[in-house]
């Protein structure tokens, strides 16, 4: 798991520019894809489910998934998830990039955004969210991909 404080050259789906605000959470998870026998769509569903599970620890109301890769609260984007595969040295890797708006809402044209702080009126330790995300993915990802086979 790689964590970034700030992204200066991030990108979103279809190569769009990814806007990142300092104080929010930006994480990349890496998996050897040779060991994963799921479609990208199945992996998208699993990763969205796990991030939604994380957010539900802090926000107790409805969280929606908007295809292909966003999580919304009150019709506003709180999280984006980008997945891609790369080939290196005869191995395929899955990279899952996750951006969660913890304390700031990026300004995206014609796309309302929100952040966890504005929703719950309480600052949450970014370190705690990082550790919770790591714990959820370590404990649940493997069991979920094995169920899908």
Predicted features along the sequence, with ranges:
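Flexible, acidic active-site loops/lids enriched in D/E/S/T/G that coordinate Mg2+ and/or position polar
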Residues: 1-9, 13, 17
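General beta-strand structural signal in soluble alpha/beta enzymes
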Residues: 4, 63-67
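Short, histidine-centered active-site or binding-site loop motifs used for metal coordination
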Residues: 6, 31-33, 120
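Gly/Ser/Thr-rich helix-start
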Residues: 11-16, 24, 81, 98-100
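DPxDG-like acidic metal-binding loop motif
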Residues: 13-35, 43-44
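Long, positively charged amphipathic alpha-helical accessory segments at protein N-termini or as interdomain linkers
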Residues: 35-36, 41-63, 73-149
